[in-house]
Amino acid sequence: MISLFHGLFLSLILFILGLTSLIVRRNILFILISLEIMMNAVGLALIVVGSYWHQADGQIMYIFVITLAASEASIALALLLQLYRRKKTLNIDILSEMNG
């Protein structure tokens, strides 16, 4: 069984990896993937803490996190598909320019 420290440390590394990628990347698809990595890191932390305290609350919260991530990803991918069809790019710097 994984210890509390190792599980939370792995979760922290995943969260920092997702946050760094969120800040550095300029492609909206990679930003969405970074958000998914961050949500999975939070879910891992919930499961590790729940397992450490022998409570099922962490696993129940993780089900909610998975549900939130799935709905967020499906809506965001549908919006990205429409955005790409209209603008032919997913670069956030180009999309943020105002056209007048």
Swiss-Prot record:
**Do you know which NCBIfam families this protein is assigned to?**
PRK05715.1-1, PRK05715.1-2
Q: Report the source organism.
A: Buchnera aphidicola subsp. Acyrthosiphon pisum (strain APS)
Task: Name the major location.
Answer: membrane
Subunit structure of this chain's protein: NDH-1 is composed of 13 different subunits. Subunits NuoA, H, J, K, L, M, N constitute the membrane sector of the complex.
The topology of this chain with respect to the membrane is: Multi-pass membrane protein
Q: Which GO terms describe its cellular component?
A: NADH dehydrogenase complex; plasma membrane
Its Enzyme Commission number(s) read 7.1.1.-
Keyword list (alphabetical) reads:
Cell membrane, Membrane, NAD, Quinone, Translocase, Transmembrane, Transmembrane helix, Transport, Ubiquinone
Q: Where are the transmembrane segments?
A: 4-24, 28-48, 60-80
Q: Which family does it belong to?
A: Belongs to the complex I subunit 4L family.
What Pfam families would the database entry show? Answer: Oxidored_q2
Name of the protein this chain belongs to: NADH-quinone oxidoreductase subunit K
HAMAP family found in the cross-reference section: NDH1_NuoK (MF_01456)
- Provide a Gene Ontology MF annotation, just one: NADH:ubiquinone reductase (non-electrogenic) activity
Query: Which compartments is it annotated to reside in?
Result: Cell membrane
Alphabetical list of InterPro entries matching this protein: NADH_UbQ_OxRdtase_chain4L/K, NUOK/Mnh_C1-like
Q: What does the UniProt record say this protein does?
A: NDH-1 shuttles electrons from NADH, via FMN and iron-sulfur (Fe-S) centers, to quinones in the respiratory chain. The immediate electron acceptor for the enzyme in this species is believed to be ubiquinone. Couples the redox reaction to proton translocation (for every two electrons transferred, four hydrogen ions are translocated across the cytoplasmic membrane), and thus conserves the redox energy in a proton gradient.
The reactions it catalyses are: a quinone + NADH + 5 H(+)(in) = a quinol + NAD(+) + 4 H(+)(out)
Supply one GO BP term: ATP synthesis coupled electron transport
